[in-house]
Amino acid sequence: MASTPWISFTTDYGLADGFVAACHGVLARLAPTARVIDVTHLVPPGDVRRGAAVLAQTVPYLPAAVHVAVVDPGVGTARRAIALTAGNGLLVGPDNGLLLDAATALGGVDAAVELTNPDWLGARMSATFHGRDVFAPVAARLALGAPLADAGPAVEPGALVRLPTPLVQPETDGFTAEVLTVDHFGNVQLAATGALLESLPRSLRVAHRPAVHARTFDDAPPGGLLVHVDSAGLVAVAVNGGRAADLLAVTPGDQLRVTAG
């Protein structure tokens, strides 16, 4: 890592409690020269898919770093704690699919280990707070240049847990795609890439509602439904001045059909 290392930090811990601060404290004590970028701590509780999407869509724009992510409904169970290298980054977190989309965005998994070395872990080991006691201590050591192999035994990249592939179904007059995420503004991001939208006309229908094929929000009238390619290169459905998720009554995992109108 760089002489002044970077660590990014993504969780579902929220900001009402001291969980984030405790992890920051561990990082500061063990790696006082590291700079920490808080990606978000407002991932919906236990929503691994949302955490994976946020992380994967953010890491390409961060400096070379150790990326710590904790959305871990299986904490304390037999699920593995892992660290892996991918491109110019390292990722640390639970083996529940959270890290692998980000690893792909960085160029793919080069090597992975299970975090079992007790010398790398916190002196106090809580069964329910591995962010503080496992992932933060490991991230700090990696940020300071400790070898990944010293953290624990190697894991075959193909044996890592992966999230199910979201549905994307091209059709003659459009496509059906799974809702990947809903952001703070109520915009509905689909798993479909922007290429599926290119050949469709300006007049569209989304779940039988009229919409426009747009480049910006203002291409639709106020309150109008629009479909565009978002900043991650994926198809998104939005409302100019409103919340598409509320209008369409959809949540992540639902399916939406986008067709020529």
Swiss-Prot record:
Its EC number is 3.13.2.3. Pfam families: SAM_HAT_C, SAM_HAT_N. GO terms for molecular function: hydrolase activity. Transmembrane segments: none annotated. Disulfide bonds: none annotated. Keywords: Hydrolase, S-adenosyl-L-methionine. InterPro entries: SAM_HAT_C (IPR046470), SAM_HAT_N (IPR046469), SAM_OH_AdoTrfase (IPR002747), SAM_OH_AdoTrfase_C_sf (IPR023227), SAM_OH_AdoTrfase_N_sf (IPR023228). Activity is inhibited by chloride. Adenosine binds at D12, D72, N187, V239. The keyword Transcription regulation does not apply. Belongs to the SAM hydrolase / SAM-dependent halogenase family. Catalyzes the hydrolysis of S-adenosyl-L-methionine (SAM) into adenosine and L-methionine. Is likely stereoselective, specifically hydrolyzing (R)-S-adenosyl-L-methionine ((R)-SAM), the inactive form of the ubiquitous cofactor SAM, and not the active form of SAM, (S)-S-adenosyl-L-methionine. Probaly plays a role in preventing accumulation of (R)-S-adenosyl-L-methionine in cells; maintenance of (S)-S-denosyl-L-methionine homochirality is important for cellular health given that the (R)-form is largely inactive as a methyl donor and can function as an inhibitor of methyltransferases. This is (R)-S-adenosyl-L-methionine hydrolase. It comes from Salinispora arenicola (strain CNS-205).
